[in-house]
Amino acid sequence: MARDPGAVRAVLWDMGGVLTTSPFEAFARYERERGLSPGFLRGVNATNPDDNAWARLERGELDPLRFDAAFAAESAAAGHRVPGSDVLALLVGDLRPGMLRAVAACRERATTALLTNNVTPLDAVEPEIAAVLGHFDVVCQSSEMGSRKPELEFYRTACARATVDPSEAVFLDDLGVNLKPARAMGMRTIKVETPERALDELAAITGWPVAAVDMQPEAPTHG
């Protein structure tokens, strides 16, 4: 039987800023505490975005020690020296239980996949974060794949592992730069600005009752 061309057969989820609170909140706090201009850290990461220290770290080309020095040099060139180790300490946010319940609801109806740019494989970090892996049929981590969002190879591999055509997938991410190439491939995309709004959009696309999943207030982000 031919597949329904409009059917959603996989839901792809980003980690930071989607399933957890955004590390950008921790970045902003760090900048305030040290008198840096707002958005300084993101600005460093946005300079030469395909080959800077951050990109090479996420592809597994730099270890944390070499990243520490490389990011310090790049940030110094931008006006303020920030050790890369300081940035790494800001990456882990707090889990959003309501989003994880939505993942579980989707998994009853489709393949669920986690698509994350990371430094350390999730099974090597905090137990609470590592436990997230059990919610997904497919896990794609830049630290293990040698490619990262928004590189097309990352998305092609994710769809192949989920055994879906891009047109059969919905992808949730908090960064437009990551969503743009996925949308160009044919995926339906949702930019996550708030969990509630994102789940409303997901429910509208799929027709599934994910928006009814009880959302809980988030705890403050920790560093």
Where are these regions (language model features)?
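N-terminal helical cap/lid subdomain that shapes the substrate entry/recognition surface
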Residues: 3-100, 119
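Generic structural signal for small/hydrophobic residues in well-ordered secondary structure
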Residues: 14-17, 60, 106, 114, ...
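Catalytic-core regions built around general acid/base machinery
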Residues: 98-109, 135
